[in-house]
Amino acid sequence: MGKPEFERLPVYQVSEKLANEIWRLVQDWDEFNKDSLGKQIIISADCIGANIAAGTVQEQQYNQNLVRQARGCLYETIHALRLAWNRKLITENQAKKIKPIIDELSSKLNAYLKSLGS
């Protein structure tokens, strides 16, 4: 069996990269922050790729809706990262590493949604 279609999508690949970077980032937090904001940010980042993947096996209209949900999850992830930054849980170097991934993913998500006719 070959790779599922979603694994070949550049937008999915970038979403996976972001989710893995956030996972590594949260691992250094104390238990309280891992259990609260950490879980939220990991789940929201993981859901970006999950929605992209789920959409690839749906009809176009449902795929569009799932990609919109993925974009909403990206916004939730950005919100959580802003909170983490304000709470001094993220260093400047970590932020500099994650920001380009977010920028690329945002652009790719919007382009992917547009390519689906939305």
Describe each PLM feature range:
Residues 1-118:
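Amphipathic alpha-helical assembly/interaction segments
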